[in-house]
């Protein structure tokens, strides 16, 4: 009799298991990260943070977005997330004005949204998490002046695209400090289009057109390695001070070999992890982050601190 009861109970549990799994899947939160560059090295660092948060906090994460910067495609992906009734959305303000309406749609659907890296000031969002771009530029400019040691700065800038808000603000931060120096000259601003080959060709043309250039500032991750490649090929290593952005592998290698002077780091891991953490906490408790605008921090990385700078960047308890 006891064996029969045990057998029946085992069969009931076996039959119930699929339903329990379905119920758990239905209860699992779904958070969508709409990135501006789905496979770009620096955004893959954000994905690493996002995936780590998913593992730690138990939500299902979707990583979506265009392969090249395209605000319209990002808007479409946000609309898809809204239609799928995602529990939360993370995105970046590539074209803030154009993205306001879709943020309002998310709000109307009851979906909390966190903006990272560059804000959408007029749009409804739970919070913003990103580098203060003008502060980053100003800090970078001070480091460049230290390296120039009195030489007059003849500066060229490279951004991803000219209408990319965060890039413009970073350049303005550099300009606000460098323009105070005697002999400062802003030679040009060129685009990388978020493409390494395009960046290389642009730097080649730039150094040919402006042989007086002694400072090359990148506010797009691929632009720094592209500049280092061209400087080496054109024999300009000892003439041009290269300031890169982000700590992708090529840039770190170029600092180690002395081609690139420094890079301005942004904590993209934190942007992926903490943005998701805020959404989960808000969904569970209704409590929003204490501040609407949050600085994810920045640091100048040179040969002096290259071996130690990243120790705390992936530790939430250190943020």
Regions found by a protein language model. Name each.
Residues 1-30, 55, 82, 104-111, ...:
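Short, low-complexity disordered leader/linker segments with a strong preference
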Residues 30-49, 53-57, 61-80, 84, ...:
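Extracytoplasmic "Venus flytrap"
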Residues 42-57, 136-143, 165-184, 202, ...:
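Short, solvent-exposed amphipathic alpha-helices that sit
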Residues 55-67, 154-157, 178-196:
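Short beta-strand elements in bilobed, periplasmic/extracellular small-molecule ligand-binding domains
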Residues 74, 129-155, 167-168, 196-200, ...:
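Hydrophobic alpha-helical segments within soluble ligand-binding/sensing domains
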Residues 79-108, 174, 192-253:
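Hydrophobic alpha-helical
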Residues 96-135, 139, 154, 160, ...:
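Flexible loop/hinge segments that line or gate small-molecule binding clefts
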Residues 158, 162, 166, 177, ...:
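Hinge/cleft segment of the Venus flytrap/periplasmic-binding protein
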């Amino acid at each position: 009799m006891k064996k029969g009861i045990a057998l029946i109970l085992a069969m009931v549990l076996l039959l119930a298991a699929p339903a329990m799994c379905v119920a758990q899947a239905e209860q699992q939160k779904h958070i969508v990260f709409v990135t501006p560059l789905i496979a770009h090295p620096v955004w893959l660092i954000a994905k690493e943070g996002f995936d780590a948060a998913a593992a730690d906090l138990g939500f299902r994460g979707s990583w979506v977005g265009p392969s090249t910067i395209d605000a319209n495609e990002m808007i479409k992906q946000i609309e898809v997330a809204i239609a799928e009734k995602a529990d939360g959305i993370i995105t970046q303000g590539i074209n803030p004005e154009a993205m306001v309406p879709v943020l309002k749609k998310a709000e109307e659907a009851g979906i909390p949204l966190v903006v990272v890296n560059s804000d959408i000031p007029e749009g409804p969002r739970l919070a913003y998490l990103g580098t203060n771009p003008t502060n980053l530029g100003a800090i970078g400019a001070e480091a460049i002046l230290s390296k120039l040691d009195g030489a007059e700065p003849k500066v060229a800038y490279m951004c991803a695209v000219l209408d990319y808000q965060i890039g413009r603000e970073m350049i303005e931060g550099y300009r606000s400090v460098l323009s105070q120096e005697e002999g400062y000259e802003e030679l040009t601003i060129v685009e990388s289009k978020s493409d390494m080959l395009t960046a290389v060709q642009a730097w080649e043309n730039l150094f040919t057109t402006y042989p007086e250039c002694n400072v090359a500032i990148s506010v797009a991750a691929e632009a720094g390695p592209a500049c280092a490649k061209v400087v080496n090929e054109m024999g300009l290593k000892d003439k041009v001070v290269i300031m890169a952005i982000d700590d992708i592998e090529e840039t770190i290698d170029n600092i180690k070999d002395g081609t690139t002077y420094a890079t301005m780091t942004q904590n993209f891991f934190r942007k992926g992890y903490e943005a998701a953490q805020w959404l989960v906490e808000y969904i569970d408790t209704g409590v929003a982050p204490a501040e609407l605008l949050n600085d994810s921090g920045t640091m100048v990385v040179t040969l002096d601190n290259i071996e130690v700078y990243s120790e705390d960047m992936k530790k939430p308890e250190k943020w």
